[in-house]
Amino acid sequence: MPELPEVETTVRGLATVLDGQVIRRVAVNRADLRRPFPEDLAQALTGARVTGMGRRAKYGLIHTDRERTMVFHLGMSGRWRIDPEDIGKHDHLVLETGEGRVLSLNDARRFGSVDLVDTGRLEEWPPFAALGPEPLGPGLKARHLAKAFEGRIAAVKLLLLDQQIVAGLGNIYVCEALYRARIHPEREGGKVSARALGLLVPAIRAVLEESIAAGGSTLRDYARPDGELGYFAKDWRVYGREGEPCQCGGVVKRIVQGGRSTFFCPRCQK
């Protein structure tokens, strides 16, 4: 599943051809993805000017001058394509700008979603209302995590994946951040020290910023809107490296937490 860096990279790529442009044509090529497309999607977007782009958690935002925002989620396999050579069966939504640029939302597994939300009420929209702070924003501080983790016996790895605690973190980057902060993923949240939390926050930010700079991490279906792959996977220190040596001389181990693979070094993560 595309995580925060992949969505941020996607939004930035789309902005290069969409921001400030009028959407001349909208083609909705099927009725639904994970849930139905808004019935008025084509009508609401046709002729609208894009006034800005953004991201909240793992959602991309396309703001228009009609005070409506198109909110998209890439699901498991979704990606946007800019000026594709052809429109295939998995290109379920197509936008054409006044300058003739074409953007298609391609989603083979159809776990993504597209919604229309009143721009002024975005934070009240149910999927956003309970979200925690953005990990790259000023709201994520060690004291925020300390309060959220206080008295919790759940593993710190699982708590960091809770979108109500921190918005947008996913499996890959939580594994990598915990490794950099030298925190064992199974440690109870309430037992993570203030010192460790002080290391964790900058580790989260560093991992995300480095991944965004590398264009994200390409696993199976993800690619940037320009068709290029994300290259952060080559910099993974533990994720996907079960049995490989750690820099400390230990060996990377894999366990399962909450149905997801966790990678860590038992020697240097305590």
From Swiss-Prot:
The active site is at residues 2-3, 58, 260. It catalyses: Hydrolysis of DNA containing ring-opened 7-methylguanine residues, releasing 2,6-diamino-4-hydroxy-5-(N-methyl)formamidopyrimidine; 2'-deoxyribonucleotide-(2'-deoxyribose 5'-phosphate)-2'-deoxyribonucleotide-DNA = a 3'-end 2'-deoxyribonucleotide-(2,3-dehydro-2,3-deoxyribose 5'-phosphate)-DNA + a 5'-end 5'-phospho-2'-deoxyribonucleoside-DNA + H(+). Its EC number is 3.2.2.23, 4.2.99.18. InterPro entries: DNA_glyclase/AP_lyase_DNA-bd, DNA_glyclase_Znf_dom_DNA_BS, Formamido-pyr_DNA_Glyclase, FPG_cat, MutM-like_N-ter, Ribosomal_uS13-like_H2TH, Znf_DNA_glyclase/AP_lyase, Znf_FPG/IleRS. Its cofactor is Zn(2+). A zinc finger (FPG-type) spans 237-270. Coiled coil: none annotated. GO terms for molecular function: 8-oxo-7,8-dihydroguanine DNA N-glycosylase activity; class I DNA-(apurinic or apyrimidinic site) endonuclease activity; damaged DNA binding; zinc ion binding. DNA binds at residues 90, 109, 152. The keyword Hydrolase applies. Binds 1 zinc ion per subunit. It comes from the Bacteria. Keywords: DNA damage, DNA repair, DNA-binding, Glycosidase, Hydrolase, Lyase, Metal-binding, Multifunctional enzyme, Zinc, Zinc-finger. Pfam families: Fapy_DNA_glyco, H2TH, zf-FPG_IleRS. HAMAP family: Fapy_DNA_glycosyl. Belongs to the FPG family. Monomer. This is Formamidopyrimidine-DNA glycosylase. The gene is mutM.
